[in-house]
Amino acid sequence: TGQFSNDYIKPFSITFIHFVACVADIALGLITFLPFLIFMYFSSFKLITLPSAQNALLFIITLILAMVMNFFFNLIFHAFTFHHGDRRSLIELINFVTSFIAGSMFPLAFLSGTIKNIFMALPFKYLFYVPIEVFLGKMTTHQITLSWLTIIAWSVMFFVIYKIVFATGIKKYEGTGR
């Protein structure tokens, strides 16, 4: 469609443009979901225990860091489209597998043995499992700080990989479209 070409020639970084779009998409989803959350709370407030203000703040910070890490991870695969063409279905499959490994479909605490060790060694636990543990107050401040540092380290690594893949791919890019 030429959308990438249009974004690429703008005076802003293409990464920044896509980051702002990602944040806007998440904000829209949150705004859309908020009335449902409010309804859920008021219809069952006796069953729901809200976290302390400190845990809520730590949870929000953890979510923001996890979102940034996931953004850079996804950018790597989007940058590979320079080399291999449009692979939206592959990217969706990768997102599904990532969500599964991250614990979005079941708590990683249900796992045991080698599988749990593998899932816990991967960075994807920081997308769902760790934020939920923070929300529930199951992590100490020290563990949360270590998690944040680990998320930042993974984010930097994913960003560097993305920049390398993007730099090699943009050399092959031939803008077409509008």
Where do the model's predicted regions map?
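Membrane-spanning helices that line or support transport/gating and their immediate boundary helices
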Residues: 2-3, 72-79, 83, 114-117, ...
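Junction motif at the cytosolic side of a transmembrane helix
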Residues: 135-138, 150-178
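Alpha-helical transmembrane segments and their short interhelical loops
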Residues: 26-84, 144-153, 157-160
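Hydrophobic alpha-helical transmembrane segments of multi-pass membrane transport proteins
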Residues: 1-37
